[in-house]
Amino acid sequence: MSKLFQARFATTVNDTHYLPATPLREVAFAGRSNAGKSSAINVLCNQKRLAFASKTPGRTQHINYFGLFAKDDLLAYLVDLPGYGYAAVNHETKYHWNTLLSDYLQEREQLVGVVLIVDSRRGITDLDEQMIEWFVPTGKPTHVLLSKCDKLNKSECKHTLEAVRKQLQQYDPALPDGNGESKQLTAQLFSSTKRIGLEEADNTVIKWLFEAETNEDEITN
């Protein structure tokens, strides 16, 4: 059973000053409104309504924290970031969201990686690129879930995955010529509806959150 199955709602904040004062590791989920972010969190945690999934874009307007527990011991956090790119909000709200996201991504020390949900039918948009550009300088990894891949045929899936991986290479400072396989920015196909790519995504998140713990166990043994 995945450790993600033990997720429970912890807290919600609308200002980085009120983020949990804890040394525990965090993995954040980000993405455009209606890209399937909440659905991805729910299916990975094997829960129907842990993160609120709505057909109305822009419903996630705060930073929502979900704690991962072993019995009553809090081990780590999953973080649901506000969806971006929703047009029907005023300028002041958009500015607040942008500031909230950029400050969190660039300054949160406990954040060990970002899962970026991208609609496979749209590919990486300008706003997705902005998220990547904010986070890449931290040196921490980004893993792209190409959501709703069940809407594409096999050929389209292959082409989309190859194109996105090549696009991500351009942002990796370890690949100055934009060629080669990026270790910091990775991508996979994913579908919450058809449960495609769950194991790969789960393994990535678990590795980020508990890698140090695993390494310590190996050294001890």
From Swiss-Prot:
MF terms (GO), sorted A to Z: GTP binding; metal ion binding
Gene Ontology cellular-component annotations: cytosol
Keyword field: Cell cycle, Cell division, GTP-binding, Magnesium, Metal-binding, Nucleotide-binding, Septation
Organism, scientific name: Polynucleobacter necessarius subsp. necessarius (strain STIR1)
NCBIfam families registered for this protein in UniProt: GTPase_YsxC
UniProt name for this protein: Probable GTP-binding protein EngB
Its job: Necessary for normal cell division and for the maintenance of normal septation.
Binding site for Mg(2+): 38, 60
One Gene Ontology term from the biological process aspect of the record: division septum assembly
